[in-house]
């Protein structure tokens, strides 16, 4: 039986923090599926297609180098439903600090009640990526700041292009 893990998030954009989680997650499973949540009430900076492409280009080679199968999907329902759909028994969540832990523990408890076969695995962020959030990256990029220390090079380029084309709403 292969160990399938789901790593959910908005990935708007992919950050070095997300990449750190993936580098650790691929050691824990036979297949990692990154699931991009689609929330009707939110207007992401990058389209779903752009985020899928980013996730595949940035995370795919990391999984391949580790000998881990990789997949990417989207979902617009409960995260546990997305996990069940891909056959995942592991839910990967990254933690930056105690605030993340408190929130993620609540979610993990609810998920465990709804889907007892899916186990949440918390991966603490490496020291160098703990302060990074996608929200802060978007804000810095929107103000013309250099985000190259916080995101993979191709994501920094995509952010620069996105904001050079005119400030997204």
From Swiss-Prot:
It is found in: Cytoplasm. Its cofactor is Mg(2+). Keywords: ATP-binding, Coenzyme A biosynthesis, Cytoplasm, Magnesium, Nucleotide-binding, Nucleotidyltransferase, Transferase. It comes from the Bacteria. Coiled coil: none annotated. Its EC number is 2.7.7.3. The record marks 18 as: Transition state stabilizer. ATP binds at residues 10-11, 18, 94-96, 104, 129-135. HAMAP family: PPAT_bact. Reversibly transfers an adenylyl group from ATP to 4'-phosphopantetheine, yielding dephospho-CoA (dPCoA) and pyrophosphate. This is Phosphopantetheine adenylyltransferase. It comes from Rhodopseudomonas palustris (strain TIE-1). The gene is coaD.
